[in-house]
């Protein structure tokens, strides 16, 4: 399953789930061919507060094929789109991006051109690359608190 395409497609199909994913992600989390598509979706959501594929295509016509492909990828998975799934896919995308950053730094660390004095800084960057948690405030909406409370009752 192409998690990146499926997530974008899921958000286009149900924009009520966008707040559980889009604030956590950035363009760097996506592979190069999907970066413009994600940027179009995220930018439209930030400015308009909704995700309407027709309006997004009208604003970004060069992304039409990628947007439709993402929706098709999501539909072909035949899975129910829920908040939990969107959060899971978001976490997977963030973890994959962190792993790629870590691997890139690891290759740089073993490169013959890297000096010994550069290693402590590289190791620190490797540790930071694995930190996928974004800085959030202590604020939780009543809806989130209620959701968490109900989930713990089950």
Language-model segment annotations:
Residues 40, 70, 105, 122-125, ...:
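Charge-rich, solvent-exposed alpha-helical interaction surfaces
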Residues 84, 97-108, 117-120:
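Long, mid-chain structured domain cores
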Residues 73-79, 107-114:
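Short amphipathic helix-turn segment from helical bundle oligomerization domains
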Residues 15, 45, 96-100, 113-117, ...:
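Residues at alpha-helix boundaries and short interhelical turns
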Residues 137-154:
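The Walker A/P-loop phosphate-binding site
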Residues 11-15, 31-32, 105, 111-118:
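Intrinsic-disorder/low-complexity, polar/charged segments
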